[in-house]
Amino acid sequence: MLLIVTREIPNHANKLRELFQTLKDRDIPYLVTRRCDPAIIQRTDIRGLIIPGARFRTKSHTPQSELMIEFYYLYHFPKKPVLGICHGCQVLMLYYGGSLVSYNTLWKGEYDVDLSKHHLFKGHTPAHGRNSSREQAYFYFHELPVAPPSIPSVREIAWITKFRDGRRHACAFEFAKNRVYGVMFHPEGMPATHDILYNFYDKIMSSV
């Protein structure tokens, strides 16, 4: 059972509708929680967490009561695998000591991404061909996460080939080895990247 942690209903920004459908396509069981629920943290069938996209903006160094639900489940499930998507990746970056670079305009659309050989992308055949590491992915964000240089355990695993400043920037991370990951793009947003979600689930179940 995957636990999806969000206070939102589906909308164009969080892509929850697409996330739910992608999981249903593989008959992956999931539970959605929209509040800090003491009953859920007692459950023994929760195998992993997904923190999906959100419509509101995450702020780097400003307390936000809206983030209480994410931190609640991260605290109470300290050893569970976690996948943060867009907003979820931003939350994890702050949780693990990184920061966010804020922009006034939205970064939205399909852009090229270089994928590493990380197991999250295992078995993936990129759009540019089997011998390429490059894929197109769907983005929708204002704040770009930046890994803390003082914490080498936070590892970059994918990169936007050309961001708004014309440079290459990390857009996916491994925060805790073989357990906690974040991607700034929406893998549920395009069929070509659905297998990232499936790889996350398959790895969880293979370790049960």
Locations of the language-model features?
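Zn-dependent metallo-beta-lactamase
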Residues: 1-25, 30, 35
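Amide-donor transfer/coupling interface in amidating biosynthetic enzymes
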Residues: 2-13, 39-40, 45, 71-73, ...
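Conserved strand-to-helix beginnings and helix N-cap segments that scaffold or border functional pockets
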Residues: 16, 61-65, 194
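Flexible gly/pro-rich beta->alpha loop and the following alpha-helix that scaffold active-site loops
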Residues: 21-83, 96
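Active-site metal-binding loops of divalent metal-dependent hydrolases
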Residues: 54-55, 89, 187
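Gly/Ala-rich beta-loop-alpha elbow adjacent to hydrolase catalytic centers
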Residues: 84, 88, 93
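Conserved active-site segments centered on acidic
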Residues: 94-101
